[in-house]
Amino acid sequence: MSKQASMIWVTCGCCVCWCGTDRGAATNGEALPKSSCSATGRTTSRVRDVLSGPRLRQVALVARVCDRVAGQLRGSFGWPEPFSDPGVAQFGLTNAVFAAGDTFVEVVSPVQPETTAGRYLDRRGGDGGYMAIFQVPDLAAARRRVADLGVRVVWSADLPDIAGTHLHPKDTPGAIVSLDWADPPETWHWAGPSWTGQVPGHAPGGLTGLTIEVTDPAAAARRWAAILGARARDEPPAAVVELPEAGQVLRFVPAAAGHGEGITAVTIAGLPAAVPVEIGGVSFAGEER
């Protein structure tokens, strides 16, 4: 959900800063450079070849109190200070974005009434997993696929170095799905200036999977697979979507009685906690990769 709809990051000679503008509009600043990744030394063209399928790049939790859940994540996993995106205020939210390897875990909280996040909290009955953001190599193709499926788009933006497409939650059982693109692919504008146009030093590992509670696991898995251009497999009473190139698995299971649909578990390679730890209504567990 970390989307700066009224702000854009631009280069100012020796640093990266932000200035006010509508997302997708031209800026008075200099366009972000399409350079090689400073952390790896690989060129943009070579890096782009690595990602030929979708990858889960970010997962968002929704919480009543952002600071409390963010503090629990830092305390449990030793993650560095999160990025707080001022742009999400226009969605009636506050947030914190943590780097987990070269992927990201976000916490959002509503600060205004009548927000999508607030309604989700009410349906779910408390804090929980809220959104899955997938990085795709060809956003135009992904958008065509979504249109062909009749899936509605509730928000989209196109910036020089990143673009995103939020899908209607009623068309994606279990969570909001976003299809995003980044250039260079290792960067991630939504994580703030340290990840904009460059890749900072970071711990190894990253997101390896989600568990999503839904009313109909088989139907939900087929829907997500169609959106992502992947394949679904039934494992009654659950169903699975695998993203083999990314080494990630999405597992759909029957929703618990009395709970709404939502993301209930996240696995992360390199996470210190081998035993699951529940934070913000989501079970976090480490996984070897």
Enumerate the language-model features and the residues they cover.
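Low-acidity, Ser/Thr- and Arg-rich intrinsically disordered low-complexity segments
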Residues: 2-23, 27, 33-46
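Amphipathic alpha-helical segments
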Residues: 65-80, 141-149, 216-231
